[in-house]
Amino acid sequence: TIQWPFFLKDPEKGIINEHARDFYNDVIDTILHYHKKPFVSLEHWDIPAAFLKDFDGWCDRKMLEYYRLYARRVFECFADRVPYFFAFTEPNIPIDNGYMDGIWYPFTHDPKKCYQAHFHKMVATAIAKQEYLPFQKKYHGKLGAMIHYTPVYSRSEEIRDVIAAYYADLLQVRIYLDPYLKGSVSKEFMDVLKENDCLFTYEKEDLKLIHDYRIDILGLDYYFPIRVQARETDYEGVFHPTKYYEPYIKPDRRFNADRGWEIYPQAIYDAGMRIKKDYGNFDWFISENAV
């Protein structure tokens, strides 16, 4: 991953830190020396601290043009040798942890800001593809994204459990699969956000960008599934996706006690079949998988 705060010494003006550029050039050249293909991500959670301090990071539209400038600088420096770029690695993690679950900075539960930030990352991915196109035509590389993939399984085939799984999938999985692979933010997704007073603001041009500039390849970071059941109690309080479901612990699951994660290899096959069935057999690979 190229670290945005390290690579640009002035992220507002797009001024490159020459030491950082030389460091990444050395890494890329070393990978090529050993006849390997470098896969380079533009963002794996960290952004310039000033952007968080001054305007709340990805919650603000200002990030879109700053990210455009950053992506352009990365491509200018490395596109001649890097065949695979990725706009984001696990774009949802810092947003969900910071603005929905409140366990990372800024330690808040603000669903409106959360989904605004998610949407801006969807648009930023399209912007990265737009900026990459001239380099793609010259060097024939690909621009993708790597998502934190948590496939959803219902406790049973009982209708209430199936509906719970539908909402978990819509809000936790399709949130990025649909814009990345179909070029659209689903109406069902937007309807749920609107119903819960946390629909993001957007411009018509944003949706056109998402539609017109889609990724070329998808990376799946898979560690564990999400198992859900229908809620047994009514949800109260500020909106959270679990308004529509509760976690379900499968009694006979294989379990990594160190991490607290279920081990379920079948999900990788299921992911491939889902992408084949629902997303036109899109080009994908396993980008992370471990316990």
Where are the regions that the model predicts?
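Active-site region of glycoside hydrolase catalytic domains
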Residues: 11-12, 25-291
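Active-site-adjacent substrate/metal-binding segments within catalytic domains
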Residues: 1-24, 30
